[in-house]
Amino acid sequence: MKVINFAETNSVLNQYVAEIRDVAVQGDRMRFRRNIERIGEIMAYEMSKELTYSVKQVQTPLGVAPVSTPDDEVVIATVFRAGLPLHTGFLNMFDHAGNAFVSAYRYYKDKECRTVDVHIEYIATPDLSKKTLLIVDPMLATGESMELAWKAFVTKGMPAKLQIACVIAVSYTHLTLPTTSR
């Protein structure tokens, strides 16, 4: 699995990440959501570089111009509700993309409230067969909900490609998600 850590490179993205992590700023809900959306836009742009492109001829007012455009059929997927601002940021960049959603919630498996589990409630997605699936989730803590979302999504077809975008993440996904989607 290829991991790109955008925080390792100086860019305005680091300002948005700093603000969502800053206790003095994160209480401003609108700014928090907008910063997550902005991060989504930047990540979507960077991830678009991994798509397959072909040259198309476009008629302009001055003549015909060759332009490289993506060939991939992209579907942007997220786990409801926390993922919606990041999902919106991706949609701002991939305006031809399909949408996929999975609803998941955490619950305690024991009376002492020590053991937490994740339950997938429902899934709404187009057929994912031969598509490029971008799963976007702002916070990847244990990776369990991401793993369950992946398993739920592939019941609707095996994507040709999988890319995952997380604002804050840990290394658990290296152990549970495929290095390729096949």
Question: Language-model features: where?
Answer:
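PRPP-associated nucleotide enzymes
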Residues: 1-175, 182
